[in-house]
From Swiss-Prot:
Its EC number is 4.2.1.11. It is found in: Cytoplasm; Secreted; Cell surface. This is Enolase. (2R)-2-phosphoglycerate binds at Q163, K338, R367, S368, K389. The active site is at E205, K338. Its cofactor is Mg(2+). Mg(2+) binds at D242, E286, D313. Belongs to the enolase family.
Amino acid sequence: MLTIKDVHALEVMDSRGNPTIQASVILSDNTKASAIVPSGASTGKREALELRDNDKTRFLGKGVLRACENVNSVIKHHLIGLEAINQAFVDERLRALDGTPNYANLGANAVLGVSMALARASAKALNLPLYRYLGGANALTLPVPMLNIINGGTHANNSIDFQEYMIMPLGFESFREALRASAEVYHTLKKLLDGKNQLTSVGDEGGFAPNFNNNVEPLEVISQAIEKAGYKLGEEIALALDVASSELVDENFNYHLKGENKILDSHELVAYYKKFVAKYPIVSIEDGLSEDDWEGWAFLSKELGRQIQLVGDDLFVTNASLLQKGIEKNIANAILIKPNQIGTISETLETIRLAKHHAYQCVMSHRSGESEDSFIADFAVALNTGEIKTGSTARSERIAKYNRLLEIEHELKGGIYIGKELFKHG
């Protein structure tokens, strides 16, 4: 029986220069694997707690030495000797060991790092790729990437209110071709922005961060880039938004679009989106309303839920209980999946299974603070999520996930690229 021999953690750096945890697990056959935990910029208030040191003399208070120490002492002590391939049992032990609903004691960053490293070590010991270990024989589907090519909001220091303007390459036969087309659109967009004397510096997730007069102009220039690159807008490459509305809302559920000097209530903001959807081939809107604006979400879902994908990120924070509430209230029709919002691989799996059971789409997602770790690429294929958000075709921490997906596609001798079939379920 494979058991856990050792567990340890190290403070390393993420893509924004902030500290994060690298956890390592060694098994009884001396197999070793590590995992690096990501971190978000715009975070939902109900996310599992990321433990920081708050020592202002180190990393402006963002150090993670306490979380590392929790791995190196408490977690290590309780996990040594446990069966390695029983992921659910080990993850449940981690949850019980913490004793809070949001990992406030040990830190979700400490717990997730160990959970990820354990899955990777077990797969390695069994000589299986991670996607096959987690997903079994049914892990065959390459996800449609949602590439963030213009950044705004908290991901960029510019005048755009919406956090992400994305492209989705739906009309292709393979992941490789879809990614190639996306990269060509990205480079074409850069030339267009250069021609408009716009900034082509990039945001946290590799997208450009130009200044525009309103929130419509990015849709226009992206549409131009798609067509100039030689692709059919809406047919081969569609558009998607992450509004990150929780960053725009006040206590009265009024939404402040500072770039346009507008203040809109929930119904007015939904009407604003409907104009966008009528004019542009937008197939997905994420966090269109605040995480606390459940009434507004119900209206948004009623108005647009049959036309496009409505993704809950801050709304659900990868939490099965919150997702169940959304299901019961007919709110949204898709969920963003971020393992560090919930704490362990097993809890993430539970949420994905619940979503799939109720025909909610799942979008595997990175965070704005990432690393070279490509775990989510395998995870997306393992669970056949059908979609993945992992940034633009720039910045190596984003490219690491795309390169891993290319590798998986090759191993699967093509696999199945879901493409246009993604939105034909209903």
